[in-house]
From Swiss-Prot:
Recorded GO MF terms: potassium channel inhibitor activity; toxin activity
Disulfide bonds: C5-C23, C11-C34, C20-C39, C24-C41
Identification of the protein by name: Potassium channel toxin gamma-KTx 4.11
Domain topic, free-text comment: The presence of a 'disulfide through disulfide knot' structurally defines this protein as a knottin. Has the CSalpha/beta fold, which comprises one or two short alpha helices connected to anti-parallel beta-sheets stabilized by three or four disulfide bonds.
Xref: PROSITE patterns: ERGTX
Pfam families: Toxin_17 (PF08086)
UniProt similarity note: Belongs to the ergtoxin family. Gamma-KTx 4 subfamily.
Role played: Reversibly blocks Kv11/ERG potassium channels.
Tissue specificity statement from the Swiss-Prot or TrEMBL entry: Expressed by the venom gland.
Sorted UniProt keywords: Disulfide bond, Ion channel impairing toxin, Knottin, Neurotoxin, Potassium channel impairing toxin, Secreted, Toxin, Voltage-gated potassium channel impairing toxin
Cell compartment(s), UniProt: Secreted
Superkingdom in the source lineage: Eukaryota
Single GO cellular component term: extracellular region
Length: 43
């Protein structure tokens, strides 16, 4: 689920991050981006 994406992600401060995006898509979200080094999934 989307919370596991956040836990796993070590990404840049801002912007697109492939691993985060993949995880979010598997969780049924539209896209994943990074905000302050955390993955955020957007519906």
């Amino acid at each position: 689920d989307r919370d596991s994406c956040v836990d796993k992600s070590q990404c840049g401060k801002y912007g697109y991050y492939g691993q985060c995006d993949e995880c979010c898509k598997k969780a049924g979200e539209r896209v994943g981006t990074c905000v302050y080094y955390k993955c955020k999934c957007n519906p």
